[in-house]
Design a protein with these regions (language model features):
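Alpha-helix N-cap/helix-start capping motif
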Residues: 15, 86-87
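Phosphate-binding/catalytic loops
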Residues: 81, 87-139
Length: 139
């Protein structure tokens, strides 16, 4: 199974989610699930935000080498689940032809921390971890 974490720019929420998911999967010894991340409006090649990297580093995750990536049609066909940060992301995915049954929208939605201070990114990181753990328990 492949889970793609989807946000807007792929510089904050989705790369944080990807790293957190990998950490959780490792903790749970789940080897049958892969994860990735992409943005719906990413500027390909942009680095993660400094505060996203710092918030992840605080919990032992290094996302500093991540570069933004726009969701491709190939991934849209090969991913099993699209974990959307907000209902708006889910809507865009549906409009792009992704079947509804492949879309999981975070509940509650994960607000965009872009431009916020480190505390905002910490709150985002913690909300992501809670949402990802809850989702993985459903599988």
């Amino acid at each position: 199974m492949k889970i793609m974490f989807i946000c807007t720019g792929n510089t904050c929420r989705s790369p944080m989610a990807e790293a957190l998911c990998r950490k959780i999967l490792k903790e749970q010894n789940k080897t049958d699930i892969r994860c990735g991340s992409a943005g719906l409006s990413a500027m390909d090649g942009e680095p993660v935000s400094d505060n996203a990297a710092a918030a992840c580093a605080e919990v032992g995750l290094d996302i500093s080498r991540h570069r933004a990536y726009t969701l491709s049609s190939m991934e849209a066909e090969t991913a099993d689940v699209f974990f959307a940060m907000t209902p708006s992301h889910g809507y865009v995915l549906r409009r792009a032809g992704v079947p509804q049954e492949k879309i999981h929208v975070a509940s509650p939605e994960i607000p965009d921390p872009f431009g916020g201070d480190l505390a905002t990114y910490r709150a985002c990181r913690d909300a992501l971890e809670t949402a990802i753990r809850a989702y993985l328990e459903e599988l």
